Amino acid sequence: MITSGAIANEKVLFSRYVDTDNWDMLVLLDFPSPAKAAQWQAQERDNPAGLDQDALKLISAISTYPLDLMQSAAATTPAEKPVYLVLPYDYTVSPDEYIAYLRDYVRPQAAGWIEEGVLASYKMFIGRDAGGRPWSSVLLLEYKSDEALGQRAAVIAKVRAKLRADPSWKAISDGKQSVRVERAAILADELK
């Protein structure tokens, strides 16, 4: 599908651990235009998730969630052995307020994690028509390696300590529990 131009980019992630309450495989598809996304919708009518009948026989559940990419950034050097941390959230404020939260609270942290050399990239998505879904937004963190992921807690603490010097960032940090609810994080590897 990528070679036909219907899909601009795809990423296939597999959860590292067995978890009956979460997904085993996550496929992120980027469409180059709304028209191409509409073509995919037509494809899904005949082939759910784009899978043929033989593949569908192997699957017990499929869910499709249209998402909008709100923000993203990447380090100048790509990860050689990336590890993905998928963080689903439900936001409890208006979409505009949540987008401001992503811009003013999450983005400075993710930029710091990239600067510290542990994060290769991040993407922040908001679900379309998220009512009734298990989550309404997703933060996709691509760590450079397992070693980089192991430094996560220390790097988060270091970056947040720097950011707390900014009173506006600190105010958002202090009130973040009223903005979103974090769901179960999923550690995943990419199928290449």
Residue ranges and their predicted role:
Residues 1-49, 54-163, 172-192:
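Short S/T/G/P-rich N-terminal loop/turn motif that feeds into the first structured element of a domain
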